[in-house]
Amino acid sequence: MQIIRDTSAINPEPSVATIGFFDGVHAGHRYLIQQVKEIAAAKGLRSALVTFPVHPRKVMNTNYRPELLTTPEEKISLLADIGVDYCLMLDFTPEVSRLTAREFMTQLLKERYQVKYLVIGYDHRFGHNRSEGFEDYVRYGKEIGIEVIRAKAYTSNIEIENVPNVPVSSSLIRKLLHQGEVDLAADCLKYEYFLDGIVVGGYQVGRKIGFPTANLSVDDPDKLIPADGVYAVWVTFDKKTYMGMLNIGVRPTIDNGPNRTIEVNILPVSYTHLT
């Protein structure tokens, strides 16, 4: 996958594209992207995703905390594994936010990114205030030379609270993680939810009582942390993977007041390399 941030330096070839923030790169995203790839192969064109390095709402409101399922780096890595040709990274600026859907399609999709076919997710909207819909995009596409295609809706086999075939969305996955439903979240994501960070110094009280723990500082402060609780986890450290136990919440080994922490206990290996 080629990541293109500056089209003045690299001119993308004509493509079949879709647009989205793709937080989590979940099952619904993957189904949409697979359709893009299939149409691109049939048309003899490149496949492309137009996405944003920063959540659009955070650009407009710096106090907004998006609770990301994937950091920008994690998202790019997951998208690369899917195998699209281009990841077109668009900086969402106040100027971009003011573009109507027609202006966005003309100035960015057609003139900058050379998009020939635009595949729209079943509930996706774009343009100023997201006030226009699929039929508008089709009409604008005919006027400027982009064929707009409605993607097939993704039907899950996931049942939640006795409701079958629940539509998968990033919002649903956030809700599940806030409830501690990590298994259901994994079903929606098609991979186990993960946290990435560095080990930071602690009080080492756990070591004294026979349960040495590593204190984790998550790399991105906007990354969503699941509900407080104890979880069985896989821990990757120094290119090796171990079974572990993760505690999220107030430290059980020491009075840490109201501060929320993440502690992992790796078993059954030596802990000396974590200090």
Which residues does each predicted region cover?
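Aromatic/hydrophobic pocket-lining residues that form π-stacking "cages" and hydrophobic walls in ligand
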Residues: V36, Y137, T272
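Phosphate/ribose-recognition catalytic cores of enzymes acting on nucleotide-derived substrates
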Residues: G202-L274
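Short acidic-hydrophobic, aromatic-tinged amphipathic segments that line or gate anion-handling sites
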Residues: Q2-S8
